[in-house]
């Protein structure tokens, strides 16, 4: 068993705009993060993944970067950033920065030059094409709705933007672009950064011919994802990046890779291939999406969740490494999506944490998850800020004539602003996030759900997360044990084991408010048992043979095999 620090770590994601505002302008900032580092130390996390703080016009909340080597004014200064890094390192917390290199902002100096003329030295830093028959070069749809192409009058050509029109895609076929990216990465690593989370990194290689996507009935544009996800040169580029940059530092890397299968996941994460340490796969995040994509909402089933999680656990075992997550800045709140955010909010938040943190992989906690923050239902589209949500609403209501209330229901369930409402620190005005007017409204349930209340209550979701993190430090089996699913067909109970030598964890989670009976399979015989954690009071003497589970109950036993 080779010990690796990033396998043993727990990562906490900070979305800086919504974390804590130190100066009253309504926007979270770097000094706000510094002010709350003792809170993260108390929770026990090892790594912070910081969403982008680079200079940006903020079209997509910092994922549109105009200067990779400077800090956004709203967030502070480079001096603030250095102080934050020092204060994190003092507390034994590492810093992973967001690396956004599929695209830049259209206000980046490279793009400003690129659009000036067809023979500008920066022209082929981006993907420019002439139109076809007076229309876009192909029929690709942007992830944020509408065409993925924008016409530019200056040279009479179109540029590709898989995201917003203010996020032109970089041309990774150009070795100069790659060199610029690697130099920028070294700039941050030499300042002491401990790794990168790489935004949509599996989209950097496009099929050079940029063919049309499969047309969708009733839609003007088509998905071109098969021509830009896991493209022809993506592994070549990542191996080059590893050779030139990553291999020279002791860091952790995680790639965001929508649409990746376990077989592809291994190509990115098998250590012998020298690319990335782990990826964020999306299969479990797509279980409630139909063929029409994210906004085509379907009920998810526990059977599908078991199948998906088990597939990733088993297929990467001994080859790659999993990232474990249910929440991030792009997803709705897990307790509202997979649990019960009403009567059983606390129980189901703890159950979901148990289910996730006991699997093999590196767990990620998104800010507010550790206190059981929930989705929000703002009354009006005017209360929303996310470009993806606003573009989708406009397209569906204005162009397709859909019922505005039905579109709002989709946003309430799946919108990214569910994750972006301000962190709920206490029950004072604006949840203690800001002394000013918050950039996005606060979830009205902050009076009940907040950090202050969580710290004071020994049975809170926070203290449960803290215990899960401590257990990870005490038991190698949680990090390195192999995973096996038991009870594949049970509609309510997700039960699996982890095994290392003659030790085994039995993880029992009830994904319902029903009270199903758990029975220990006859083939499991043990010498001793110990209850490691549970979200209800449990009689330690209770036999494992047959247990009636309570709503959203979770238990983890450690047994010694004969």
Swiss-Prot record:
* Source organism, top-level taxon: Bacteria
Thermal activity characteristics from the UniProt entry: Extremely thermostable.
- Report the SUPFAM superfamilies cross-referenced here: (Trans)glycosidases, Glycosyl hydrolase domain
CDD domains on file: AmyAc_SI_OligoGlu_DGase
Which Pfam families would you find in this protein's record? Alpha-amylase, SusG_C
GO MF annotations, alphabetized: alpha-amylase activity; metal ion binding; oligo-1,6-glucosidase activity
Q: Which UniProt keywords apply?
A: Calcium, Cytoplasm, Glycosidase, Hydrolase, Metal-binding
Its EC number(s): 3.2.1.10
Residues at the active site: 199 (nucleophile), 256 (proton donor)
Subcellular location(s) per record: Cytoplasm
Q: What is its main location?
A: cytoplasm
Q: What reaction gets catalysed by this protein?
A: Hydrolysis of (1->6)-alpha-D-glucosidic linkages in some oligosaccharides produced from starch and glycogen by alpha-amylase, and in isomaltose
> Which biological processes are named by the entry's GO terms?
oligosaccharide catabolic process
Q: List ligand-binding residues for Ca(2+).
A: 21, 23, 25, 29
The record places the site described as Transition state stabilizer at 330
Q: Name one GO cellular component term.
A: cytoplasm
The record's top EC class is hydrolase
The family note in this entry says: Belongs to the glycosyl hydrolase 13 family.
Q: What is this protein called?
A: Oligo-1,6-glucosidase
Q: Which organism is it from?
A: Parageobacillus thermoglucosidasius
Q: Which gene encodes it?
A: malL
């Amino acid at each position: 068993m080779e010990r690796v620090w990033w396998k043993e770590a727990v990562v906490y994601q900070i979305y800086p705009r919504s974390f804590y505002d130190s100066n009253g302008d309504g926007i979270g900032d770097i000094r706000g993060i510094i002010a709350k580092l003792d809170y993260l130390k108390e929770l026990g996390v090892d790594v912070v993944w910081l969403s982008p703080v680079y200079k940006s016009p903020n079209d997509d909340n910092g994922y549109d970067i105009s200067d990779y080597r400077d800090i956004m004014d709203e967030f502070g200064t480079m001096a603030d950033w250095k102080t934050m890094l020092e204060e994190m390192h003092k507390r034994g917390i590492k810093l992973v920065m967001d690396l956004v290199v599929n695209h830049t902002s259209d206000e980046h100096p490279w793009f400003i030059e690129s659009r000036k003329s067809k023979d500008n030295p920066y022209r082929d830093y981006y993907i420019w094409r002439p139109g076809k028959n007076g229309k876009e070069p192909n029929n690709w749809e942007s992830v944020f709705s509408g065409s993925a192409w924008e016409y530019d009058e200056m040279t009479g050509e179109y540029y590709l933007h898989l995201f917003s029109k203010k996020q032109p895609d970089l041309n990774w076929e150009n070795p100069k672009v790659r060199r610029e990216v690697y130099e920028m990465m070294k700039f941050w690593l030499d300042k002491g950064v401990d790794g990168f989370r790489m935004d949509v990194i599996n989209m950097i290689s496009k099929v050079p011919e940029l063919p049309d996507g499969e047309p969708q009935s009733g839609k003007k544009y088509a998905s071109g994802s098969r021509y830009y996800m896991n493209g022809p040169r993506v592994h070549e580029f990542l191996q080059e990046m590893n050779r030139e940059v990553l291999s020279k530092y002791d860091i952790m890397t995680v790639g965001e890779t929508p649409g990746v299968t376990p077989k592809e996941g291994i190509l990115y994460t098998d250590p012998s291939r020298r690319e990335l340490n782990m990826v964020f796969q999306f299969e479990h995040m797509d279980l409630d999406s139909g063929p029409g994509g994210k906004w085509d909402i379907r009920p998810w089933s526990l059977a599908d969740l078991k199948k998906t999680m088990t597939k990733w656990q088993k297929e990467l075992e001994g080859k790659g490494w999993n990232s474990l997550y249910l929440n991030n800045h792009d997803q709705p709140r897990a307790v509202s999506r997979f649990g019960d955010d009403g009567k059983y909010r606390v129980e189901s938040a703890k159950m979901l944490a148990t289910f996730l943190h006991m699997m093999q992989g590196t767990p990620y906690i998104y800010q507010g998850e550790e206190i059981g923050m929930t989705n929000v239902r703002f009354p009006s589209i005017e209360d929303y800020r996310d470009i993806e949500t606003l573009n989708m609403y406009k397209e569906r209501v204005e162009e397709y004539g859909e019922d505005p209330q039905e579109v709002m229901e989709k946003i309430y369930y799946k919108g990214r602003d569910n994750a972006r409402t301000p962190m709920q620190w206490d029950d004072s005005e604006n949840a203690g996030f800001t002394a000013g007017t918050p950039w996005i409204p606060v979830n009205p349930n902050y009076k009940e759900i907040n950090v202050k209340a969580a710290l004071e209550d020994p049975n809170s979701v926070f203290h449960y997360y803290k215990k899960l993190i401590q257990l990870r430090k005490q038991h190698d089996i949680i990090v390195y044990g192999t995973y096996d699913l038991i009870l594949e067909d049970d509609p309510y109970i997700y039960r699996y084991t982890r095994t290392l030598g003659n030790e085994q964890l039995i993880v029992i989670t009830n994904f319902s408010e029903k009270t199903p009976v758990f029975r220990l399979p006859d083939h499991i015989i043990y010498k001793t048992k110990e209850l490691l954690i549970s979200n209800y009071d449990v009689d330690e003497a209770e036999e494992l043979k047959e247990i009636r589970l309570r709503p959203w109950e979770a238990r983890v036993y450690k047994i010694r095999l004969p």
